[in-house]
């Protein structure tokens, strides 16, 4: 144990925050941080509810600064609720820069993925906004591809899970990353 950083990633609406709250409500092994909350400390959300990020580079720099501050402050392993692939202001999927993973010291990535129809339903219930199902599917495939790339270039481990993943299995995955 001791200050490992694992990113829990997935498309908007896959249920990352719910998954973490459901599994870690009474847990003290990990510190769970939200990338959007860390960015929000210094910058008002600018996605206008459409889940598009208007300044990817600036957001990542803010996130990196805040994340490194948190890593210095806590001694437990950190689970970061965030993204490795997002929609930019033009609606095009964009990968989070590789440099972020290196500078932040990300030890591993856990991808939470689910059925496209279920994700679309969650998006509608939560935001009243549903991304095209083809885009959701493409984003999930791009996430997997990017994880493979980060592993082959930098040896950043990854694992794909779904919402049925139990707490004990999740902990074992974190330990292996």
Model-predicted segments: where are they?
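Conserved lysine of the Walker
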Residues: 16
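Loop/turn-to-beta-strand initiation segments
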Residues: 74-82
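Small-molecule kinase domains that catalyze NTP-dependent phosphoryl transfer to phosphate-bearing small molecules
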Residues: 129-169
């Amino acid at each position: 144990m001791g200050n490992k950083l694992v990113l829990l990633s997935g498309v908007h609406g896959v249920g990352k925050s719910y998954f973490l709250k459901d599994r870690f409500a009474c847990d003290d092994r990990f510190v769970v941080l939200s990338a959007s909350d860390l960015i929000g400390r210094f910058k008002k959300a600018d996605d206008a509810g459409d889940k598009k990020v208007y300044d990817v580079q600036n957001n990542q720099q803010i996130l990196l600064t805040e994340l490194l501050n948190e890593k210095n402050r806590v001694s437990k392993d950190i689970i970061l609720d965030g993204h490795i692939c997002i929609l930019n202001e033009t609606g095009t999927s964009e990968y989070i820069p590789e440099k972020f993973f290196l500078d932040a010291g990300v030890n591993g990535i856990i991808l939470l993925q689910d059925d496209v129809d279920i994700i679309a339903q969650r998006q509608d219930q939560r935001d009243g906004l549903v991304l095209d199902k083809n885009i959701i599917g493409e984003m999930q495939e791009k996430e997997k591809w990017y994880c493979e790339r980060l592993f082959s270039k930098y040896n950043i481990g990854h694992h794909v899970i779904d919402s049925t993943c139990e707490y004990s299995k999740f902990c074992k995955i974190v330990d292996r990353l």
